[in-house]
Amino acid sequence: MNCINITTSPTDRDLIGRSHWWGAPDLPEDVPYPYVMVTDRNVLVGDDGEPRCDAEGNELYEEEEYPEPLTFICQVRMEDVAPLDKEGLLPRKGMMYFFAAIDYFLGEDSPIEIPMHGEAGDMVRVIYVEDVPDDLQPYDLHWEDTGESVFRPAEAMTFGPGDETAGCHAMLSVPYQDEVTDPNPGYIALLQLEEDERWRLRFFDCGSLYLLIRPDDLRRRCFDNMRCEVFTY
């Protein structure tokens, strides 16, 4: 397997339509930003300030459902990585966008969290756009209470050839830990994330996050069966 190492660096350069880590995704207008629906249960309180109960003494709740955005990780311009993909697993053109519920590992509160092991479900989204329009614009998303952008400052991405088992951010790596490979035979890491103190990105004491996919699914551009593994030492 030909692993592709990823290096990121702060920049003042315009990254619209380019590969970049963090920042805002340049999604085409017809591609919606991925959200997860969250249901909150709130205890009903009476005029006396005490929880309201039914005839059997059970507390009464009301449910509120709202959308929670996934964290944007990066977008990869396929032309940047195609020369390094010797096995032809990745598309040759277009843009690939990565989103996941990783706020917890960035030291932030969030009602959603990526699974530690197994099927990623709706907590990971990979969006591939083959024909990218010329008029891309960064997606606009702000916190309701402050009006500030939810996105971190964007960093430029550079790519290079790497060993099969990467020790850095990477694409197409093969996890070397038995705890990751044994429950996921035949999977590779479409994206591997390592800890970075600059972003307060930590996987407990020390670890890695693997967003896993079968090579055949990747060739078919099928991202519905992604798995994830948070490995910690």
Where are the predicted features?
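Preference for intrinsically disordered or flexible, low-complexity segments
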Residues: 1-233
